[in-house]
């Protein structure tokens, strides 16, 4: 059969399955593709095809992830499923698989388990904004009251981590039975996708967000002024816009963009993804440097102290061979530059072993433009020893 031309008319959403090992994440992923395939919205993928997720070398870390895509009547989805718990931790912290929403799979037969809690916490920390619950293996539970109990438990757990537990859709189903083609259970998969369509909003496009460009290089053009180059991370910048220069300085400086150049051509505007040079009015060459960002006035601030969720590379992944302790002072690489920072470990944690993931407080020696969700890597003498994501700004 000829491959159907891919319709890009539908809005695109990135989602993934999360939850405890053996609660049925991969079976559910297979069931979604199989049920939607009947309506022509997907290519059916068997459990084995998804479970044999290729290992990806993402920036030197090995992550196994399965990517599938499918469509409902209103949307196009890219869906990630990770076989192992460590893969989720790495994926979510490095942002290798960005999620606009998650389907939390909980076995009705077992109820919430340790990784259920961990994945909810991780989702909260790395900023997965919406969660829909699929209560799986309901064919194995005859007792209606027991199902209601498990549902209440899951809702309470979600509320505990700051998700709206009372409002989150919970669908009771059986991924395996749906995969085997039993109509009643297939209907539950359709119900799940209807809830996902309705409950997880279409993400704001990068171009609709406030302008931000990390500065990679700076040079001066005689008679014209100072040019900052970099790749626009989000938003749109137009000639004549007033922007701020943020980070690595006591206070933000304000300037007007008097020219935008790309591939040696002058443009009226540039947008997310473009590599540009921005000509800045009244800025001396020494007042601006790599590692700062240009951003829409008031949209982002420079901070030096924050809490972060961090994944420390194992020895096998090229990380440290020995643990580190509180007051460890590595470099934190944000966007285009390294800044030294001091690590404080949580109460009761003496040390961090290679391969661990942990929440820590970091204080940089100079402020950097950061927000919740900003990704960074931790480096020591030029080599990466960990990855992190800003969970909360302290000051």
UniProtKB/Swiss-Prot annotation:
UniProt-listed Enzyme Commission number(s): 3.6.5.3
Domain tr-type G: 10-204
Residue positions binding Mg(2+): 26
Binding site for GTP: 19-26, 81-85, 136-139
InterPro entries cross-referenced by the UniProt entry: EF-Tu_GTP-bd (IPR041709), EF-Tu_GTPase (IPR050055), EFTu-like_2 (IPR004161), EFTU_2 (IPR033720), G_TR_CS (IPR031157), P-loop_NTPase (IPR027417), Small_GTP-bd (IPR005225), T_Tr_GTP-bd_dom (IPR000795)
Coiled coil keyword on record: no
Gene Ontology CC annotations of this record: cytosol
UniProt region (G5), positions on chain: 174-176
Stretches the record annotates as G4: 136-139
Domain of life: Bacteria
Region annotation (G1) ranges: 19-26
Chain intervals for the UniProt region annotation (G3): 81-84
First-listed, main subcellular location of the protein, grouped into a coarse class: cytoplasm
Top EC group: hydrolase
Swiss-Prot/TrEMBL catalytic activity: GTP + H2O = GDP + phosphate + H(+)
PROSITE patterns: G_TR_1, G_TR_2
Record localization: Cytoplasm
Function: GTP hydrolase that promotes the GTP-dependent binding of aminoacyl-tRNA to the A-site of ribosomes during protein biosynthesis.
Subunit structure comment from the entry: Monomer.
UniProt family annotation: Belongs to the TRAFAC class translation factor GTPase superfamily. Classic translation factor GTPase family. EF-Tu/EF-1A subfamily.
Entry protein name: Elongation factor Tu
Encoding gene (name): tuf
């Amino acid at each position: 059969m000829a491959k159907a031309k891919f319709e890009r008319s539908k809005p695109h959403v990135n989602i993934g399955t999360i939850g405890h090992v053996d609660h049925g994440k991969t079976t559910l992923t297979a069931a979604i593709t199989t049920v939607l395939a009947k309506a022509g919205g997907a290519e059916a993928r068997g459990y084995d095809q998804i479970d044999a997720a290729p290992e990806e070398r993402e920036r030197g870390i090995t992550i196994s992830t399965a990517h599938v895509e499918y469509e409902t009547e209103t949307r196009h989805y890219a869906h990630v499923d990770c076989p192992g718990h460590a893969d989720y931790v790495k994926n979510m912290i490095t942002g290798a698989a960005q999620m606009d929403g998650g389907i939390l799979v909980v076995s009705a037969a077992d109820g919430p388990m340790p990784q259920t809690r961990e994945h909810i916490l991780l989702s909260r920390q790395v900023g997965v904004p919406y969660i829909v619950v699929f209560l799986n293996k309901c064919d194995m539970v005859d007792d209606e009251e027991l199902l209601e109990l498990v549902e209440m438990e899951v809702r309470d757990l979600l509320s505990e981590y700051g998700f709206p537990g009372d409002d989150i859709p919970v669908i009771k189903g059986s991924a395996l039975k749906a995969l085997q083609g039993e109509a009643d259970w297939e209907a539950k998969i359709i119900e799940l996708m209807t809830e996902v369509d309705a409950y997880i909003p279409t993400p704001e496009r990068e171009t609709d967000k406030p302008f931000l460009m990390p500065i990679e290089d700076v040079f001066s053009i005689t008679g014209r002024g100072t040019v900052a180059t970099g790749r626009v991370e989000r938003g749109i910048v137009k000639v004549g816009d007033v922007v701020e220069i943020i980070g690595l300085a006591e206070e933000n400086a304000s300037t007007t963009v008097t020219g935008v150049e790309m591939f040696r051509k002058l443009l009226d505007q540039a947008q997310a993804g473009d590599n540009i040079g921005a000509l800045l009015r009244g800025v001396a060459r020494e007042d601006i440097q790599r590692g700062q960002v240009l951003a829409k006035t008031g949209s982002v601030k420079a901070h030096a102290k924050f809490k972060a969720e961090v994944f420390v590379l194992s020895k096998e992944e090229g990380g440290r061979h020995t643990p580190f302790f509180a007051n460890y002072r590595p470099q934190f690489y944000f966007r285009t530059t390294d800044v030294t920072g001091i690590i404080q470990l949580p109460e009761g944690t003496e040390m961090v072993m290679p391969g661990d993931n942990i929440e820590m407080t970091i204080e940089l020696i100079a402020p950097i433009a950061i927000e919740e969700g900003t990704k960074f890597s931790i480096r020591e003498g030029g080599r990466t020893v960990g990855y992190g994501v800003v969970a909360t700004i302290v000051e």
